[in-house]
A protein has these predicted regions:
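A structural signal for short, hydrophobic/glycine-enriched beta-strand patches
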Residues: 2-292
Length: 292
């Protein structure tokens, strides 16, 4: 019996080799989905892919940690889920690598045959999936889904990936604090970073004013909200000092900026977004040189 549905659980950085609240919520959502699916149909044509490698400071892969927790939850039910297959992508350290490496794992698994059509459902936290589909909609040239679809299509496997967020399994972000809100706002700027990456690489063969407009608008709105939040608190001095730097990166990269300058501001934006992502993530371990 061939696989016709692939559930992809995207990984989240571990803390002391343990799943964080985000990671736990993603596996909980997978199990909830499989339990409902069992009411309607067998899971034997469904495969699950756990994605995520070993990040710095850890010795366990995100994929392994999620799978272990998945088995713990499965054991609480009278019958196992009897999936068609479980795949592991354990070489990646970020979402881009998740998707790129997963395509290779799918092809190498031998589970998918030429001429086959496979429905794909992503499972992750809402902000994470929203960013993936937002980038795909605004800048298809830079989208991660395009890589996955094209790699599999080259071998005759057609992936059916709905571009609507609600067709997947977006799990509510678990941290409703000021820090959590700032983390989400900084994540919004990922879209502008991806725009700069595409612009510096010459990826866009269309009007750059149109390409840049929405990423720029989203980022400016996020920065305004972030300024309001840090202004109401004395706890985020580092964030407050870096917000003008991020704003400057956007202001100084209009569409007529030369490529060398775009790359310089991309480096500045990317470095500071990574720093703020790790600094603001409520699930980060800040005991060891976390900024590297």
């Amino acid at each position: 019996m061939s696989i016709n549905h692939l559930l992809i659980v995207l990984g989240k950085r571990l803390n002391e080799n343990k799943l964080t609240d985000e990671g736990i919520s993603r596996v909980d959502a997978l199990v909830g989905y499989l339990v409902e699916l069992l009411v309607e149909e067998s899971n034997q044509q469904t495969a699950v892919a756990f994605c995520g490698g070993v990040t710095k400071g850890q010795t366990l892969s995100e994929a392994d940690a999620m799978h272990q927790y998945f088995r713990e939850l499965e054991a609480q039910y009278e019958h196992p889920f009897k999936l068609g297959a479980i795949l592991f992508e354990q070489r990646s350290t970020n979402t881009v690598e998740n998707i790129q490496n997963l395509a290779s794992e799918m092809i190498d698994s031998g589970l998918f045959t030429r001429g086959q059509s496979v429905k794909v459902t992503f499972i992750s936290n809402d902000y994470h999936l929203q960013r993936i589909f937002e980038i795909q909609a605004l800048m298809d040239e830079q989208g991660l889904l395009k890589v996955l679809i094209e790699k599999c299509s080259a071998l005759g496997v057609e992936l059916q990936i709905d571009r609507k967020l609600e067709s997947h399994i977006p799990v509510p972000y678990p941290h409703q604090t000021t820090q959590g809100q700032l983390f989400l706002l900084m994540d919004v700027l990922t879209t502008y970073r991806v725009y700069l990456e595409g612009a510096s690489a010459g990826a866009f063969q269309r009007d750059l004013d149109i390409v840049r407009k929405e990423p720029q608008r989203l980022s400016v709105e996020a920065l305004v909200k972030a300024k309001e939040l840090v202004g109401d608190s004395s706890l985020f001095g580092i964030v407050e000092s870096l917000l003008p730097v991020l704003e400057h990166c956007i202001q100084q990269t209009p569409v007529d900026t030369d490529t060398k300058k775009v790359r310089e501001y991309l480096a500045l934006l990317d470095t500071n977004l990574t720093l703020l992502n790790r600094y603001l993530d409520p699930e980060s371990d800040h005991t060891h040189r976390w900024w590297r």
